[in-house]
């Protein structure tokens, strides 16, 4: 399996420099979503002192013509800090800074989906929407070959790998453990991890997060994963169907509840929300991957624990349905439901906004409603 040249550099030499004192200065790594709607970019600046909150962080700029976000003739774009985390790579007092992107005219960039999501979340803040997202991903060599797979063939059939233990079942656990600890250090709300059904496929869970924070924490968790994989010389892909054939795809199952759903007899509100979702299936399919449903078409086949992309379905404990009500929720008659349709490479802001629009703002039809200021 091919690994990156950088992973073969002597890390001990790097550590000699990283252990040097930095005085009162702080390194802040600014992170943003690029013009693909999937890729992340970052760059670092020096601050004179440690910021205590995100409001103390300065705005910055970058060359949007090199990130698929603007033309070269008018390429300056703005980075507006919206979330701050501890930096697990440089350690305290250094920071990771997640940013929204704005164009030269101060309008949000096309892939800045956080801007509209924040507005929608503010409209329903009194209902306290909680989200939890289950991020699946696949580890690959730099040659695009799945990590740990035979160079001239395939591993044994699916079955022993889900939550598997042992060198012949768990491929890449060191990366998973490093990512988990780095997220905890950063302050990302990571709640668990497990090996998935396909070998070299893993999952981590983020949440519960209220409102806009769901997207903030998931994007930063993805960034940390990419950086950890960079150190190990491998790639983490969020492609929803990285290997064709009889192998599971990768999703980002999204769990959702409101205060009313979590309280006694909340199942009534869960069922009402599912009924609303059933009448707006195609709108959600378009929102649930960056290519308007084309990526998910490779994954949502009705096989490998997925629903069919053309049909809406719901059921208790049914992993072949669009919407799953966990068995414990059915028994306790309160809790949350799981939307199993979002793809692994979805934008969490698009997913959570769509759910709120349909379930809480009672929107119908195939287009989002345009609210006045």
From Swiss-Prot:
<dbReference type="GO" id="GO:0045648">
    <property type="term" value="P:positive regulation of erythrocyte differentiation"/>
</dbReference>
<dbReference type="GO" id="GO:0005886">
    <property type="term" value="C:plasma membrane"/>
</dbReference>
<dbReference type="GO" id="GO:0005524">
    <property type="term" value="F:ATP binding"/>
</dbReference>
<dbReference type="GO" id="GO:0005829">
    <property type="term" value="C:cytosol"/>
</dbReference>
<dbReference type="GO" id="GO:0005783">
    <property type="term" value="C:endoplasmic reticulum"/>
</dbReference>
<keyword id="KW-0564">Palmitate</keyword>
<dbReference type="GO" id="GO:0010594">
    <property type="term" value="P:regulation of endothelial cell migration"/>
</dbReference>
<feature type="modified residue" description="N-acetylalanine">
    <location>
        <position position="2"/>
    </location>
</feature>
<keyword id="KW-0808">Transferase</keyword>
<keyword id="KW-0479">Metal-binding</keyword>
<feature type="binding site">
    <location>
        <position position="203"/>
    </location>
    <ligand>
        <name>Mn(2+) 2</name>
    </ligand>
</feature>
<dbReference type="InterPro" id="IPR027303">
    <property type="entry name" value="Gln_synth_gly_rich_site"/>
</dbReference>
<keyword id="KW-0256">Endoplasmic reticulum</keyword>
<keyword id="KW-0963">Cytoplasm</keyword>
<keyword id="KW-0007">Acetylation</keyword>
<keyword id="KW-0436">Ligase</keyword>
<feature type="binding site">
    <location>
        <position position="134"/>
    </location>
    <ligand>
        <name>ATP</name>
    </ligand>
</feature>
<feature type="binding site">
    <location>
        <position position="253"/>
    </location>
    <ligand>
        <name>Mn(2+) 1</name>
    </ligand>
</feature>
<keyword id="KW-0832">Ubl conjugation</keyword>
<keyword id="KW-0472">Membrane</keyword>
<feature type="binding site">
    <location>
        <position position="134"/>
    </location>
    <ligand>
        <name>Mn(2+) 1</name>
    </ligand>
</feature>
<comment type="similarity">
    <text>Belongs to the glutamine synthetase family.</text>
</comment>
<feature type="region of interest" description="Required for glutamine-induced ubiquitination by CRL4(CRBN) and proteasomal degradation">
    <location>
        <begin position="2"/>
        <end position="25"/>
    </location>
</feature>
<feature type="binding site">
    <location>
        <position position="196"/>
    </location>
    <ligand>
        <name>Mn(2+) 2</name>
    </ligand>
</feature>
<dbReference type="InterPro" id="IPR036651">
    <property type="entry name" value="Gln_synt_N_sf"/>
</dbReference>
<comment type="function">
    <text>Glutamine synthetase that catalyzes the ATP-dependent conversion of glutamate and ammonia to glutamine. Its role depends on tissue localization: in the brain, it regulates the levels of toxic ammonia and converts neurotoxic glutamate to harmless glutamine, whereas in the liver, it is one of the enzymes responsible for the removal of ammonia.</text>
</comment>
<keyword id="KW-0460">Magnesium</keyword>
<feature type="modified residue" description="Phosphotyrosine">
    <location>
        <position position="104"/>
    </location>
</feature>
<keyword id="KW-0492">Microsome</keyword>
<dbReference type="GO" id="GO:0006542">
    <property type="term" value="P:glutamine biosynthetic process"/>
</dbReference>
<dbReference type="GO" id="GO:0001525">
    <property type="term" value="P:angiogenesis"/>
</dbReference>
<keyword id="KW-0547">Nucleotide-binding</keyword>
<dbReference type="InterPro" id="IPR008147">
    <property type="entry name" value="Gln_synt_N"/>
</dbReference>
<feature type="binding site">
    <location>
        <position position="136"/>
    </location>
    <ligand>
        <name>Mn(2+) 2</name>
    </ligand>
</feature>
<dbReference type="GO" id="GO:0004356">
    <property type="term" value="F:glutamine synthetase activity"/>
</dbReference>
<keyword id="KW-0496">Mitochondrion</keyword>
<feature type="binding site">
    <location>
        <position position="319"/>
    </location>
    <ligand>
        <name>ATP</name>
    </ligand>
</feature>
<dbReference type="GO" id="GO:0097275">
    <property type="term" value="P:intracellular ammonium homeostasis"/>
</dbReference>
<feature type="modified residue" description="Phosphoserine">
    <location>
        <position position="343"/>
    </location>
</feature>
<dbReference type="GO" id="GO:0005739">
    <property type="term" value="C:mitochondrion"/>
</dbReference>
<feature type="binding site">
    <location>
        <begin position="203"/>
        <end position="208"/>
    </location>
    <ligand>
        <name>ATP</name>
    </ligand>
</feature>
<keyword id="KW-0037">Angiogenesis</keyword>
């Amino acid at each position: 399996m091919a690994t990156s040249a950088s992973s073969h550099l002597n890390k001990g030499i790097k550590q000699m420099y990283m252990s040097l004192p930095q005085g009162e200065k702080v390194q802040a790594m600014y992170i943003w979503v690029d013009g693909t709607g999937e890729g992340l970019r970052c760059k670092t600046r020096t601050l004179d002192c440690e910021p205590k909150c995100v409001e103390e962080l300065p705005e910055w700029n970058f060359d949007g013509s090199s990130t698929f976000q603007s033309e070269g003739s008018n390429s300056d774009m703005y980075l507006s800090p919206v979330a701050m985390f501890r930096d697990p790579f440089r350690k305290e007092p250094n920071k990771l800074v997640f940013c929204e992107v704005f164009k030269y005219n101060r309008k949000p960039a096309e892939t800045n989906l956080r801007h509209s999501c924040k507005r929608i979340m503010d409209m329903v803040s009194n209902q306290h929407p909680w989200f939890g997202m289950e991020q699946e991903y696949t580890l690959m060599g730099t040659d695009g070959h799945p990590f740990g797979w035979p160079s001239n063939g395939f591993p044994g059939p699916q079955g022993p790998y889900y939550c598997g233990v042992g060198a012949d079942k768990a491929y890449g656990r060191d990366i998973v453990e490093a990512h988990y600890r780095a997220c905890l250090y950063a302050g990302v709300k990571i709640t668990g991890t497990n090996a998935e059904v396909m070998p070299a496929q893993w999952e981590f869970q983020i949440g519960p997060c209220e409102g806009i924070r769901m997207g903030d924490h998931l994007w930063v968790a993805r960034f940390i994963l990419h950086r950890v994989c960079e150190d190990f010389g491998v790639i983490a892909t969020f492609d929803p169907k990285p290997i064709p054939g009889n192998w599971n795809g990768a999703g980002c199952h999204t769990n959702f509840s409101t205060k009313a759903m979590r309280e006694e007899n909340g199942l009534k509100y869960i069922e009402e929300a599912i009924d609303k979702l059933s009448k707006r299936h195609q709108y959600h399919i378009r929102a649930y991957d960056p290519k308007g449903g084309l990526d998910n078409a490779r994954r949502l086949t009705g096989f490998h624990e997925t629903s069919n992309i053309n049909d809406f379905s719901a059921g208790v404990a049914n992993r072949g349905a669009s919407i799953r009500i966990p068995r414990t929720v059915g028994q306790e008659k309160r809790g949350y439901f799981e939307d199993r349709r979002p793809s692994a490479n979805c934008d969490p802001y698009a997913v959570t906004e769509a759910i709120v629009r349909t379930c809480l703002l009672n929107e119908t039809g195939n287009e989002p409603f345009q609210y006045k200021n």
